[in-house]
Regions:
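Residue at a beta-strand N-cap/secondary-structure junction
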Residues: 2-5, 138
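Amphipathic alpha-helical packing segments from all-alpha helical-bundle domains
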Residues: 81-106, 112-127, 157
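Amphipathic alpha-helical segments used for helix-helix packing
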Residues: 35-37, 62-89, 96-103, 130
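An amphipathic alpha-helix adjacent to DNA-recognition modules
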Residues: 4-8, 13-16, 23-50, 55, ...
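Cytosolic nucleotide-binding catalytic cores of signal-transduction proteins
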Residues: 1, 108-109
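C-terminal peripheral helix-coil segments that are non-catalytic and often amphipathic
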Residues: 131-170
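Basic, amphipathic alpha-helical hairpins
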Residues: 1-3, 50, 155, 159
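Amphipathic alpha-helical segments that line or abut small-molecule/effector binding pockets
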Residues: 55-70, 119, 127, 142
Length: 170
């Protein structure tokens, strides 16, 4: 069932509350969805990201999807899919920017370059996560994340050094 087919009636019956209670808190089911995704985004991003915790933050997003697999697919297969995409881009953007900035320590890299490199990684990871969702979340996200970051080891610093070197030449 697509999220678009779920009604307020379905939600209140499933939760054992009345319609007035639902409408007291939310204008519609999309407002409820927005609040759920905003709360999850806030929860993941309020963690102080360190070199080891960025990996955990990515896995936390995947874990949220696995724990809420049925609901995620209802949303993913609906007109509200863009909300999932926006959530992923927002979370991954912050994680990758913080990671890239940490890797740039000691280098004279322009903020514009930091953002571009972070966006590169953000798009790569969101693409992998969307592919994982498309495939039914069958692969272990920890395996995928660990493998990707082992491939990337040193490449982020190399990209940043190249950016700093180009900045120094100008």
């Amino acid at each position: 069932v697509s999220f678009d087919k779920i009604t307020v009636k379905d939600i209140v019956e499933d939760c054992g509350v009345n319609r007035n209670t639902f409408y007291y808190h939310y204008s519609d089911i999309y407002a409820l969805l927005d609040e759920i995704l905003e709360n999850e985004t806030r929860r993941v991003l309020t963690e102080n990201l360190t070199e080891s915790s960025w990996r955990d933050a990515i896995l936390e997003s995947c874990s949220f999807a696995l724990k809420n697999k049925k609901g995620i697919y209802h949303i993913y297969n609906s007109l509200s899919r863009r909300k999932i995409d926006a959530y992923l881009y927002q979370v991954m953007g912050r994680i990758m920017y913080d990671f890239v900035k940490m890797q740039a320590e000691g280098l004279s890299v322009k903020d514009e370059d930091l953002h571009l490199i972070a966006d590169f990684y953000k798009c790569a990871f969101v693409g992998l996560i969307l592919q994982w969702l498309d495939s039914g979340m069958k692969q272990d996200p920890e395996y995928i994340v660990d493998k990707i970051f082992s491939y990337l080891e040193g490449s982020t610093r190399n990209m940043l050094e190249n950016a700093a070197e180009r900045n120094d030449r100008k």
